């Protein structure tokens, strides 16, 4: 694993949604619309299929062999003035990191009598794609980036949520398996190695753990930055709408901010069928439109009430191909948001690229963000402290809650997160929990044996 240190503030939009919702098209249209407004934009895609090249109308080459670049993507290609696009090179990234790991562990291989793998034997393992995407996110924020906006075409929502949770999870594993306090004994390693007559690998192990910890912390800062948001794409319908709700709850569990819900491939209001007015095809299409509009209405209400912009993209009657179709898509996009006077019309796909239209209108990073996961002191009233965890989209039957020492393990559908308890709550016992108004409210009762007594 190799993530890049250093960093800069760069507006970053991660585009995801259920499989087949149109993530790649939405990411490309967003990036092009932003470039048309004068921004310098880099569009990265993790899709290794033909869709990105078909949508953009350009070829995305792989990185040259052995170019030594720390950025895990191929040479960025100009799509339009101000917009460059590149494909994240998952396979090449894995082989580079595997060769690096073998080089670092050469002495251990010699000790064990093992033969390192040749370059052509190194085929990527499960988990290679998330690590390549995380490395790409970090690399794009390194130094003085020559662009104003980074748009990333991410994997489907479940994979994206697990990917965004990975740095925190891996850091926790490192701290548990290789506690920093045990590193004090490293001074004894050379003496132990002489007594044993063989090299002791623990020194290198701890050095590697320290490097990984720093690199994972760096990419976690990118994910948690105020300038990084998620854009959810959905093709409205009953099944897809429920998948978006699950994704929304999973993103909230990871403290990821959603800037826009993009409802894609919307049919016209009047669905007349050419050559079959009022016939079988017209009735079938009318039913499909009604189903889509019902799902759209419910999603609009759910997201707008939480001040999330909703952007509607029309169905072009064909699969978008090239910048002409992307320009048409962006030009016909309609967005609505919650403003100071209620629901207001927006600017389509470029809403939320410079700042929030809601409470944080001063822009990303300039406004004070209230602590979302707040602890409410209700000891004087109810004898409890209440930890409020916003989880919009969560269902009561899909929640799971386990107290383990100084941690709270929260499950929302297929997603889980281990949360360290605030110091005050560590001296309490969990006395109940309830899901109210899109937030999980966990009640803690002070433990008399641990809680400080008033004099």
What residue spans do the PLM features occupy?
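Phosphate-binding P-loop
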Residues: 3-10
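Conserved nucleotide-binding/hydrolysis micro-motifs of P-loop NTPases
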Residues: 48-51, 90-94, 156-158, 179, ...
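Structural motif
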Residues: 381, 402-404, 436-438
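C-terminal lobe/tail of nucleotide-utilizing enzymes
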Residues: 2-3, 188, 216-396, 405, ...
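Short, surface-exposed loop/turn motifs with a glycine/proline- and acidic-biased composition
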Residues: 424-438
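Phosphate/Mg2+-binding loops and adjacent switch elements
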Residues: 105-238, 242-246
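Walker A/P-loop NTP-binding active-site region of P-loop NTPases
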Residues: 14-88, 144, 150-171
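Surface-exposed interaction regions enriched in Ser/Thr/Asp/Glu
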Residues: 439, 446-455
């Amino acid at each position: 694993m190799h993530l890049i240190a250093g960093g800069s503030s760069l507006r970053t939009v991660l585009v995801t949604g259920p499989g087949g919702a149109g993530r790649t098209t939405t990411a490309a249209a967003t990036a092009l619309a932003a470039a048309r407004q004068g921004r310098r934009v880099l569009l990265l895609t993790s899709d290794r299929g033909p869709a990105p090249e078909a949508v953009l109308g350009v070829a995305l080459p792989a990185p040259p062999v052995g170019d030594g670049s720390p950025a895990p993507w191929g040479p960025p290609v100009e799509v339009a003035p101000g917009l460059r696009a590149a494909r994240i090179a998952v396979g090449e990234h894995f082989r580079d990191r595997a060769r690096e790991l073998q080089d670092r562990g050469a002495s251990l291989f010699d000790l064990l009598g093992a033969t390192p793998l040749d370059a052509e034997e190194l085929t990527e393992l499960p988990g290679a794609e998330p690590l390549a995407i995380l490395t790409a996110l970090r690399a794009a924020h390194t130094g003085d980036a020559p662009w104003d906006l980074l748009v990333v075409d991410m994997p489907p929502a479940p994979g994206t949520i697990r990917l965004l949770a990975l740095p925190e999870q891996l850091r926790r594993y490192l701290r548990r398996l290789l506690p920093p306090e045990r590193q004090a004994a490293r001074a004894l390693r050379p003496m132990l190695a002489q007594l044993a007559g063989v090299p002791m690998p623990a020194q290198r192990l701890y050095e590697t753990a320290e490097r990984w910890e720093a690199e994972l912390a760096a990419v976690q800062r990118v994910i948690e930055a105020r300038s990084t948001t998620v854009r959810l794409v959905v093709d409205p319908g009953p099944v897809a709408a429920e998948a978006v709700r699950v994704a929304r709850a999973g993103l909230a569990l990871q403290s990821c901010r959603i800037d826009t819900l993009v409802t894609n491939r919307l049919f016209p209001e009047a669905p007349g069928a050419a050559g079959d007015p009022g016939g079988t095809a017209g009735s079938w299409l009318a039913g499909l439109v009604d189903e889509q509009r019902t799902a759209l209405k419910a999603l609009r209400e759910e997201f707008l009430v939480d001040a999330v912009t909703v952007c509607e993209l029309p169905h072009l009657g064909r699969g978008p191909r090239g910048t002409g179709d992307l320009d048409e898509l962006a030009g016909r996009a309609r967005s609505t948001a919650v403003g100071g006077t209620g629901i207001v019309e927006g600017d389509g796909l470029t809403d939320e690229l410079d700042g929030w239209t809601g409470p944080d209108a001063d822009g990303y990073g300039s406004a004070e963000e209230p602590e979302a996961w707040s602890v409410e002191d209700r000891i004087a009233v109810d004898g409890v402290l209440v930890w409020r965890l916003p989880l919009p989209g969560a269902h009561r039957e899909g929640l799971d809650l386990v107290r383990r020492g100084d941690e709270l393990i929260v499950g929302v559908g297929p997603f889980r997160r281990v949360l360290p308890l605030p110091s005050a709550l560590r001296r309490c016992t969990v006395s109940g929990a309830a899901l109210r108004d899109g937030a999980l409210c966990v009640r803690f009762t002070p433990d008399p044996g641990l809680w400080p007594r008033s004099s």
